[in-house]
Amino acid sequence: MNKSVIVNFVICFSLFTFHFSLASAQSKHDTITEQDYYDFFNSTINPFPVTTMGGPCNPDSVKICNLISTPEVGVLRDDTSEIFKDTVFSRADRAYIHKQALRNKNLRWKQGMMHGVNVIDGADVQHIMDSAGTEVGWPVYYKKYKLGYNKFSVPLYSLDKTKCIVYRAYSCSDNFGLGNTNVFIKKGDKWVLLKSCAPWVH
């Protein structure tokens, strides 16, 4: 048999085996539920912690914080490129994470499912800011919601669900806010911060 034919066959077979193994692994682990998201946030230490912002603009300074009902999506997809330069996640994990990032666009956080969180209507907040502009919109917002707000992404898990990527941002005015993307690893029944990237503060 021609040597080039054999080489091509081996390459094709290897690629087929990899994709089949990946699909099989994903199908076995593709059982992430909405409850998994809530369990993560309810067993995770604050991703920041915040040391540079005080009073009502420090998300750690209040017992009950506001959370926008619509999970953050786009920023997390962009930030994973930096995280994936590390060796924390395997190639199969990365493919699985990308697959998860395309789902749950219609998910809305539910009231009472996360400890210490008051879920507020993301569409209403967006309407306030869009219709009045942020300079006028923030005073209108505060009259209704009293405190600044958090935005969380859903956690994106590794195949074995022992590691995940999650984004959190906090805004309290036109001039103050912060956020970053984090990698967490599960130790016992707690999620512990492993790595942070792409932080921003304004």
Regions found by a protein language model. Name each.
Residues 25-163, 172:
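Flexible low-complexity loop/turn motifs enriched in small/helix-breaking residues
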Residues 1-33:
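Bacterial Sec-dependent N-terminal signal peptides
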Residues 10, 14-21, 41-42, 85, ...:
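Compositionally biased, low-structure terminal segments
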Residues 161-187:
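Exposed beta-sheet edge and beta->alpha loop/turn motif
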Residues 182-201:
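Short beta-strand edge/turn micro-motifs at domain boundaries
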